[in-house]
């Protein structure tokens, strides 16, 4: 009763805060209401001529229109996709440019996945270990609570990094805010229907009652708050902070529920929450021992130790291929690995990885010294599309040269004062550098992803919302889909099912809260989120209805989930997708008033 009572109070306070933030007449500094505008983008924005008008122009005028229309300017990013489609390529080759953009879009999802899995998550785990969260995270609470705290904070951030960065980038421009709304809601309904339903089809199981009800209630509260924000048309500073505060309260509730269960059961291990795996059996340990966050440097080690030269260490560390794994893997794995090699090689050159599970903590002396130079250079060249790196001090000395010089001096000092065989005491600092560098890579890839989706939306005259709930949501959720279904096949459907609902809570609360918070300035403490399309309301309503269905159906089945439940969820998503596409193409629309 304690956690549920606290949840009711928090929900009431959150709703009251949203309503209080929107009562009365328009306040000073509050954005004026916007007209719906042409061709709904899902979330309104104040603009002149819509860039989608380019398709109505003659072929000879399209390049001039794109160059001269403010709405066609893509903020951030390194490539001008609209200019490439309408200026670089002739109009007769537009299908070719679209095909190239589609392939590049798929590869961007590969970049996001590889960066998050192989570099961002391991460094985040190393930071958690260095902060002692994996040993005595809460002191007074006890050791067994720490996995829950670690899971809903560090692990949630690691798994949701592509979604969060995509949302932050999309919210940075009112023209692409519909992408963020569509992706957050679209991924939510996809994961809670298709992925959750697939788990029930693959492996019928009994769901954990209290964690399931807790997560669904929190997610319904988050969806309802977002619905209110969209209804009133803007989000204030207090409301953005309220999103983040609600997630902090969710973390507190998870830890409290774990502590209560442990107290009731004595000193036994707590049940697995949405982010913490159950204590593995011997067979499970054998299975998990063959996997690791990173598969670099996993060559078989000789029985007798020997001293490797720095050149050999560098060449081995920069090789993304493991010849032993390559021989025993199927052809399709090899093909995908070949596609990932260029990305992995660039990441290996610029992002250090600290692995607490290895004896040497993945200390590669020559490569880590190189990272001291390449990591900071990466950061300044990815900020503002390289604008900071090209800035010249006093109009003479470029910033990138100063960073390279300072990094080189520091790298030489580290190389001279360390050894190949033993990591230095300050090796944990490389985890923070790796975290920052991988975050910059994810942010850069997310920026390109948002820009190319907006370009495809302009070319095909599609709204940002439908692109967000389809391509962006599917791309960001594909990793969770495969991992959860694989986990279910291996005999852990309860853990996979809990992850479906627990993970998306982080995405919606932190994605909306942090994404809007970062766009606020001292002069404008509000972010406009006015939906000007029926599709936004269909998306929000469909997500809310799916959560209500699960909230009622799962307890009605005594938490025994089988193929009937899974089939209903997947059919529900297919019906929703058909309605969404029919709405996008104006087959379903509101009657004119």
From Swiss-Prot:
Alphabetical keyword list: Antiport, Calcium, Calcium transport, Glycoprotein, Ion transport, Lithium, Membrane, Mitochondrion, Mitochondrion inner membrane, Sensory transduction, Signal, Sodium, Sodium transport, Transmembrane, Transmembrane helix, Transport
A GO cellular component annotation in the UniProt record: mitochondrial inner membrane
Location within or outside the cell: Mitochondrion inner membrane
Annotated transmembrane regions: 94-114, 136-158, 179-199, 216-236, 240-260, 335-355, 370-390, 396-416, 429-449, 455-475, 497-517, 534-554, 565-585
Lipid bilayer topology: Multi-pass membrane protein
Annotated Pro residues bias: 268-277
Cleavable signal peptide: 1-20
Molecular-function GO term, any one: calcium:sodium antiporter activity
Family label: Belongs to the Ca(2+):cation antiporter (CaCA) (TC 2.A.19) family. SLC24A subfamily.
Name this polypeptide is given: Mitochondrial sodium/calcium exchanger protein
Gene that encodes it: SLC8B1
